[in-house]
Structures are given as C-alpha cells and as structure tokens.
C-alpha cells in the first residue's frame, strides 16, 4: 500500500502531496521536509529506492520534478516505479507533455487525475484510456455547468 505521494521540485518546493494515512499536519510537514532533504541530497546515479524508517521510498525524477511514494517494506519497488510512470503518462496525456507549471497552475486537475488512478493507497484504474475519459467527462460537465450558469445570468 502507498502511504503517501509527494511531488517536489529540484529546489525542494512541494508541488503536490497525497496522504493515504492519517497524521497530524505538524508530523506531515516534518516527514515531507526530511524526505525532500534525503532525496535531493542523493546522487543522480544512485538507486531510486531508499529504506526509510519502517517504509521504503521509491522516487523518480521527471524533468524538474521528483515523484516520490512511500510504500510498505513488503511492497514491490519496481511496481511502484511503474505506478509513478503511469501517473506521469496520465498527466502527459491530459496536459500534453506536463511540466512543473502545469502542476502549479492546475493542481486541482493533477489531484483529480491522481484520485482517478489511486484511491486509498491502492491502484484504482489501470487503463489510461478509462482514467483520461473520466477526467475529460468531468471537464465537460464543468464546462456545461459554467455555460448554463452564464446563460442563466443573462
């Protein structure tokens, strides 16, 4: 099970976080700071897996963003890397070659895509087509709602 997912920049700025365990905010901030520091201090040629406390950290850098998942010790690291890659593929499919600015200015869409893909720390939808279709359907509903509200105001 995935305990949490963090997306952060090379400068250490947190761009997205999703927690699948309950922790107080103070503890989350402490953990986030510690993990960002650990990963950013590692060399580029080192392993993408880090034993951390009773969990394993699995991370991958895409352009200027690090995608990091904390998983249980018995979970498969390579499968987790594939989950990270699938999330990046979904972001790319939606945004068209996603970049850090897409995450910053459209964070709600990035969270929505993540929620379509992973729920409760487990993979919910493995099909990219189905996940992207759900996101596009949501966009269409939002657009229709906005148009009908605008028409109602006239």
Curated annotation (Swiss-Prot):
GO molecular function, one term: clathrin adaptor activity
Location in or out of the cell: Golgi apparatus; Cytoplasmic vesicle membrane; Membrane, Clathrin-coated pit
Substitution effect: residue 33 to W: Risk factor for PSORS15; results in decreased TLR3 targeting to the endosomes indicating impaired function
Pfam families: Clat_adaptor_s
Domain of life: Eukaryota
InterPro entries: AP1_sigma, AP_complex_ssu, AP_mu_sigma_su, Clathrin_sm-chain_CS, Longin-like_dom_sf
Keywords on record: Coated pit, Cytoplasmic vesicle, Disease variant, Golgi apparatus, Membrane, Protein transport, Transport
Major subcellular location class: Golgi
Membrane topology: Peripheral membrane protein
Name used for this protein in its record: AP-1 complex subunit sigma-3
Spans through the membrane: none
One of the GO biological process terms: melanosome assembly
Function (record text): Subunit of clathrin-associated adaptor protein complex 1 that plays a role in protein sorting in the late-Golgi/trans-Golgi network (TGN) and/or endosomes. The AP complexes mediate both the recruitment of clathrin to membranes and the recognition of sorting signals within the cytosolic tails of transmembrane cargo molecules. Involved in TLR3 trafficking.
């Amino acid at each position: 099970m995935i305990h949490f997912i963090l997306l952060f920049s090379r400068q250490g700025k947190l761009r997205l976080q999703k927690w699948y365990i309950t922790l107080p905010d103070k503890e989350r901030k402490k953990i986030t700071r510690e993990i960002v520091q650990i990963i950013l201090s590692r060399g580029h040629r080192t392993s993408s897996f880090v034993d951390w406390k009773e969990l394993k950290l699995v991370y991958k850098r895409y352009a200027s963003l690090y995608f990091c998942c904390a998983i249980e010790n018995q979970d498969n690291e390579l499968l987790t890397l594939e989950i990270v890659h699938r999330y990046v593929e979904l972001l790319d499919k939606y945004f068209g070659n996603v970049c850090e600015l897409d995450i910053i200015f459209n964070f709600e869409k990035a969270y929505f895509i993540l929620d379509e893909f992973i729920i409760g720390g487990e993979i919910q939808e493995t099909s990219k087509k189905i996940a992207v279709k759900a996101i596009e359907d949501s966009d269409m509903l939002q657009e229709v709602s906005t148009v009908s509200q605008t028409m109602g105001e006239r």
